[in-house]
Every structure is written in structure tokens, then in C-alpha cells.
């Protein structure tokens, strides 16, 4: 029983974590967040479904297409919704813009793909495997491995490539990076592209385990935001731990109490973190210069 809760909770938690990782990418470079991150996941899943169902693409060949689409969509969000707000130093403009764009993307998806939930053909056998008394789907293993690989690849990119080092430099001190000749506006656009790429990738990971539709991104995006706050927007490890905590707590609540209450413990934890450690469990407290 415990093994089943842990296995299911870890799979769910890693999806939350990889979406929340996108929040961390944009916050580090620009101090902003894409509140339409859930819609980036939804669009990735629906574009992936179209590639597989309509164009007959193999699931594995479809993933690069979805990732490229995610980067284009993320760049569009930054150029249209975030950059104008940053230029005029608006504290709330980017919030309203990203929310509005998320609503627009959802409405566009409803008009293109309809409002009905659609099944996504799984690339792996859906027959569960028994491990330590837990029934684990091969797709759940793929979700965990895929999420970890994606986050590790982004970290490798940031640490080992010249473009990644520009992202890190901008995250550390945007003004200093600009003085060193780094195009910080381009770096911020790129961070939004990477953020939406991770969300779109998460969409095609989770789609075979759920139904795909225009409404699938809202709840996932909100929970990923909670994970980012719980773990800490400045900590990659915190994002992973926060995702695992929320995923396992939700699964345990649904198993022992009721699925109708599975969202409650996570929200309570979010409120407690905001009240007692606003920077997150692993986040660094901001130092105010005077």
C-alpha cells in the first residue's frame, strides 16, 4: 500500500516539478513568471496528439517537434506579454499579460481541438508491473526519468555552454551582465523559450496517462506554481523536493481520505510556507540593500 502511494506520488510530483522548473528559469533571469505555464503544457500535449494522430508520427519523433513549438510559444509570450512590462518597469503588467495570454491560448485550443477530452495513444505498454507490491505503469517510469533528464539537460546547458553561462550571468546580476556585453533581453526571451519547452515536454509525458484537452493545463499549472513556492524559486533541489512532497501528499490524501480532498493538504502547506518561510523550504531569503 505504501509502495503504491509512493510510486504514484513520485510520478505526479515529478510532473509538477518539471513544470515548476520553468517558473524558476524565468524568475531567475527577469524576476517574472509565466502564469500561462499550464497552457504551454496543454498546447504541447495537443500539438503532440496532432503529430501522432493526424500526421502519423512516432511518439519519440514527435517530442523534438513539440519542444521546438514550446520554444516558439514561450518566446511569443515574452515578446508580447512580458518585455513591454519590463521596459516600463510595471510591477503588475506582466502578471496580467501572461494570465491574459493563457486565457487566449485556452480559447484558441478549444476552437481548434474542441472542448472534449481526447485520449493520447501511449507509446509504451499500459500493463502495470509489480514492484515491491506496487503496480507501476511503464509510462509512470518514463515520466520520472523524462522529467529528471529534462532538468539535468537544462542544468548542463546552463553550466557548460556559453549561452547557458549568459543565462546564469543574467540571473546573478542583470545589470552587470548587460555591462559585460550580454544581451539580457535576448537571454530573458530565451529563458521563456526554455520554460515553455519544459512545460510542453511535460505535456507529452503526462498526456498518455490522462485525457488531453484545452482544460488540462489550468490545474497542473497552479499546482506547479505551488511547488515552486513551497520548494523555493531560487533552488532547483527545492523544486524537485517540493514536487515530490505535493505529489505524495496528494496521492496519500486521495487514498486514505477522499479524492475530493486531495488538493487540500498541498494548499495548506503552501499557506504555511508563505506565512513562515516565504522564500520556500530551500530558497534563499532576499537581502535588501539600503
Locate each region found by the language model.
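Transmembrane helix-bundle core of multi-pass membrane transporters
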Residues: 84-85, 89-160, 187, 252, ...
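Alpha-helical transmembrane segments within multi-pass membrane transporters and channels
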Residues: 57-101, 108, 241-246, 277-278
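Short, non-helical or kinked segments that cap or interrupt transmembrane helices
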Residues: 25-45, 59, 88-93, 163-166, ...
Amino acid at each position: 500500500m505504501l509502495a503504491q502511494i509512493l510510486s504514484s506520488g513520485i510520478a505526479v510530483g515529478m510532473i509538477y516539478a518539471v513544470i515548476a522548473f520553468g517558473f524558476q528559469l524565468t524568475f531567475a533571469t527577469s524576476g517574472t513568471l509565466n502564469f500561462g505555464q499550464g497552457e504551454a503544457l496543454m498546447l504541447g500535449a495537443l500539438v503532440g496528439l496532432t503529430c501522432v494522430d493526424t500526421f502519423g508520427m512516432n511518439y519519440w519523433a514527435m517530442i523534438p517537434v513539440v519542444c521546438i513549438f514550446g520554444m516558439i510559444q514561450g518566446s511569443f509570450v515574452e515578446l508580447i506579454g512580458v518585455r513591454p512590462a519590463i521596459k516600463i518597469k510595471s510591477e503588475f503588467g506582466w502578471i496580467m499579460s501572461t494570465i491574459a495570454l493563457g486565457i487566449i491560448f485556452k480559447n484558441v485550443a478549444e476552437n481548434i481541438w474542441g472542448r472534449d477530452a481526447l485520449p493520447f495513444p501511449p507509446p509504451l505498454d499500459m500493463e502495470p508491473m509489480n514492484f515491491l507490491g506496487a503496480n507501476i505503469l511503464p509510462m509512470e517510469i518514463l515520466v520520472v526519468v523524462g522529467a529528471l533528464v529534462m532538468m539535468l539537460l537544462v542544468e548542463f546547458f546552463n553550466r557548460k555552454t556559453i549561452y547557458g553561462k549568459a543565462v546564469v550571468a543574467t540571473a546573478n546580476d542583470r545589470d552587470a551582465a548587460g555591462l559585460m556585453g550580454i544581451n539580457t533581453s535576448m537571454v530573458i526571451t530565451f529563458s521563456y523559450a526554455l520554460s515553455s519547452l519544459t512545460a510542453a515536454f511535460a505535456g507529452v509525458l503526462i498526456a498518455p496517462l490522462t485525457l488531453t484537452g484545452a482544460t488540462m493545463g489550468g490545474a497542473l499549472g497552479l499546482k506547479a506554481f505551488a511547488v515552486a513556492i513551497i520548494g523555493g524559486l531560487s533552488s532547483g533541489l527545492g523544486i524537485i523536493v517540493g514536487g515530490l512532497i505535493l505529489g505524495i501528499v496528494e496521492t496519500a490524501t486521495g487514498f486514505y481520505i477522499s479524492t475530493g480532498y486531495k488538493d487540500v493538504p498541498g494548499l495548506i502547506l503552501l499557506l504555511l510556507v508563505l506565512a513562515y518561510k516565504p522564500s520556500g523550504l530551500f530558497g534563499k531569503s532576499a537581502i535588501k540593500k539600503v
